Amino acid sequence: MTDAVQNETVQEASAQEENKLIAERRAKLDAIRKSCKANGHPNDFRRDALAGDLQKEFGEKTKEELEELNHVVAIAGRIMAKRGPFLVIQETSGRIQAYADKAVQKVLKEKYQGLDIGDIIGVKGALHKSGKGDLYVNMEEFELLTKALRPLPEKFHGLTDQEMRYRQRYVDLIVNEDSRQAFVVRSKVMSAIRNFMITKQFMEVETPMMHVIPGGASARPFITHHNALDMPMYLRIAPELYLKRLVVGGFDRVFEINRNFRNEGLSPRHNPEFTMMEFYMAYADYKELMDLTEELLSSVALEVLGSTSMPYGDDTVEFGGTYTRMSMFEAIKHYNPDHAQIQALTEEDIQNRDLMVSIAKSVHVEVESFWTCGQLLEEIFGETAEPKLMQPTFITGYPADISPLARRSDDNPFFTDRFEFFIGGREVANGFSELNDAEDQDARFKAQVEAKESGDDEAMFYDADYITALEHGLPPTAGQGIGIDRLVMLLTNTHTIRDVILFPAMRPQA
């Protein structure tokens, strides 16, 4: 028997076993419906305690102290294990056991025996402690609140299919403690960032999710159609241009935490919809943003995890202290010590396209015909340096032709006052001193339109209203976007974005 045939046989047997269990549970539910008024789904049980709180408050008390207290509680949750008279009940704060003594089992024998793993029940009783020191509820009464018709995966074959974890996240969250904790951390990260920004006098705002003109980043947009207006609209790829309009309007410090949508491929680091925090700060430059980012990230790590040092894969990353800062040009040279062409490269050579194409091909970059010198430099960096940036690093010196919204450097107008922040071998944030010269922005938008006409479908559109806003005067401003999903990946030591997005994009099953 081949492995494929054997696997198919195992799957068929598992499916048959699952169908049998489902049929048995449906029969139990039918019997319950005939014997109660709530059609098998009562809604009058109210819990007054959570497992986690009970463990904190009573976990250290002795068996004798608990017996003397005779503290009666009402708990509710999902049955995760059933071992004779003991049930393990799980809810949002943790797990606790419930014990049905012989008297309870005698009175409620049929009802108790009908309970299955996965059922949701409510239990009332006094807190006790087992001989092993485990806290439990001595069941005085219980009520079946929801009959689970499908067994949990461990019951028949285990949740071993990684893709199924993402398709049926509800099952993954029931059986996988690591998954639950990842999303608890995510929630705490969002709260910590929001609180930090508010303490720095930033105002939280909301900008449109549907745009008439997509802008704020170089990416392919999702296109929809507005029936009433009979016009195409675009899901936003970034909120940047709207946020800067607010700075023009007089809100000097604004931030937004929300979704962006980009019609691009899937990868361990990319999902078509993702969460960003973008903020803009008048009368500041990109160097001040780097300082603020160091403070923000170390603060978030400390608040969420209790430490600025944490494992990531085989490495340990450190969010505390001062982060490394180097230009993209310096990073390429630093991480390619044995590449003769790169070591001989000067900043002036970057504008020699033939030379840059030669170097790019030598490091296995597949070059597109419409790429500019700046794009070639970025691709060489991404191929040879980015994966090696495990510790917090700011990369500066981004060329203007790949930074259409960033202010040009006063020292060399080929470059901009822009940085990207890397940690764990990936980009997590992008920031720069904003371009507030309306005429320069007009010229760069036109260059983007030309690039789009030449085949670059990620190039930006021309936004005339944004030019009008700049003509009213944008004060010197710095702005930044931080990828929440990638940050959470680092803080949870996970290596695919699907593990930190509750419902990631998936191809429909056949």
UniProtKB/Swiss-Prot annotation:
Mg(2+) 2 binds at residue 427. Keywords: Aminoacyl-tRNA synthetase, ATP-binding, Cytoplasm, Ligase, Magnesium, Metal-binding, Nucleotide-binding, Protein biosynthesis. Binds 3 Mg(2+) ions per subunit. Its main location: cytoplasm. SUPFAM superfamilies: Class II aaRS and biotin synthetases, Nucleic acid-binding proteins. Its cofactor is Mg(2+). Pfam families: tRNA-synt_2, tRNA_anti-codon. It is an enzyme of class 6 (ligase). GO terms for molecular function: ATP binding; lysine-tRNA ligase activity; magnesium ion binding; tRNA binding. Signal peptide: none annotated. The keyword Plastid does not apply. Its EC number is 6.1.1.6. GO terms for cellular component: cytosol. It catalyses: tRNA(Lys) + L-lysine + ATP = L-lysyl-tRNA(Lys) + AMP + diphosphate. Mg(2+) 1 binds at residues 420, 427. Transmembrane segments: none annotated. It comes from the Bacteria. This is Lysine--tRNA ligase. It comes from Vibrio campbellii (strain ATCC BAA-1116). The lineage of its organism: Bacteria, Pseudomonadati, Pseudomonadota, Gammaproteobacteria, Vibrionales.
